[in-house]
């Protein structure tokens, strides 16, 4: 039996709270069960140097975990003087995922930065970050439309993400920490609302997985992402 008596294809309870802080153009607290991430979107009228004069915008992301977001305190990366490899990998994943949902030409020469700060971690922090940041990005874009900066909406569609894996020989969706730490296979899937995939990250932690198991995991991920899209749309009032 899974934690909280969930079915194998059942994600954790998802809660998305918009306008969680008052300063950012977009601000969301996203909760996947006990995993909680604050996602904020900041709009700047500037683009990276390599995009100057190109007539298009940019979407990027940063990711971090609060020192006591886990069972024992972690040292802040700022105190170490550099970001770890895991952090850089995750924030690049978040940024790639969010750029897929935006027509960068229609955004114009401006940049939107999504900051994803993990308040409490219980597995799936990167997938929760992508899910919450997508909503915060929509709010930031809507603020540009409302103030007349943008005439057309550059959002091409929502993006969501979920973890799947094989635990005790069973394919399961949205792994909690205790499942993730014991998984034979661990996979993160990022999808567009139309079903196209942005990223699939899969690793056999124990036994290699078969082609049939891969297809089963991808089907589970699609089911889970579809439920997340419903939560995102409800949060946005769409």
Curated annotation (Swiss-Prot):
Residues binding phosphate, per UniProt: 86, 124-126
Molecular function, one GO term: tRNA binding
Record-listed E.C. numbers: 2.7.7.56
Keywords noted in UniProt: Nucleotidyltransferase, RNA-binding, rRNA processing, Transferase, tRNA processing, tRNA-binding
NCBIfam families associated with the record: RNasePH (TIGR01966)
UniProt function note: Phosphorolytic 3'-5' exoribonuclease that plays an important role in tRNA 3'-end maturation. Removes nucleotide residues following the 3'-CCA terminus of tRNAs; can also add nucleotides to the ends of RNA molecules by using nucleoside diphosphates as substrates, but this may not be physiologically important. Probably plays a role in initiation of 16S rRNA degradation (leading to ribosome degradation) during starvation.
Subunit structure: Homohexameric ring arranged as a trimer of dimers.
PANTHER family in the record: EXOSOME COMPLEX COMPONENT, EXOSOME COMPLEX COMPONENT RRP41
Name assigned to this protein: Ribonuclease PH
């Amino acid at each position: 039996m899974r934690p909280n008596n969930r079915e194998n294809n059942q994600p954790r309870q998802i809660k998305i709270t918009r306008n969680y802080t008052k300063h950012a153009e977009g601000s969301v607290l996203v909760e996947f069960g006990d995993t909680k991430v604050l996602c904020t979107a900041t709009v700047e009228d500037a683009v990276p140097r390599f995009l100057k004069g190109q007539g298009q915008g940019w979407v990027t992301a940063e990711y971090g975990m609060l020192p006591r977001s886990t069972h024992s305190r972690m040292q802040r990366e700022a105190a170490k003087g550099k970001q770890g490899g895991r952090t850089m990998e995750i924030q690049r994943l978040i940024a790639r995922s969010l750029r897929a949902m935006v027509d960068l030409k229609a955004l114009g020469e401006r940049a939107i930065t999504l900051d994803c700060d993990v308040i409490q971690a219980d597995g799936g922090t990167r997938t929760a970050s992508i899910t919450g940041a997508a909503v915060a990005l929509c709010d930031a874009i809507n603020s540009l439309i409302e103030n007349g900066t943008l005439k057309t909406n550059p959002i091409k569609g929502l993006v969501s993400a979920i973890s799947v894996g094989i635990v005790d020989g069973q394919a399961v969706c949205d792994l909690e920490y205790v499942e993730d730490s014991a998984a034979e296979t661990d996979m993160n899937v990022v999808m567009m609302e139309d079903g196209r995939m942005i990223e699939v990250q899969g690793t056999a932690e124990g036994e290699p997985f078969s082609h049939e198991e891969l297809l089963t995991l991808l089907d589970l991920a699609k089911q889970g992402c579809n439920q997340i899209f419903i939560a995102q749309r409800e949060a946005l009032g769409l």
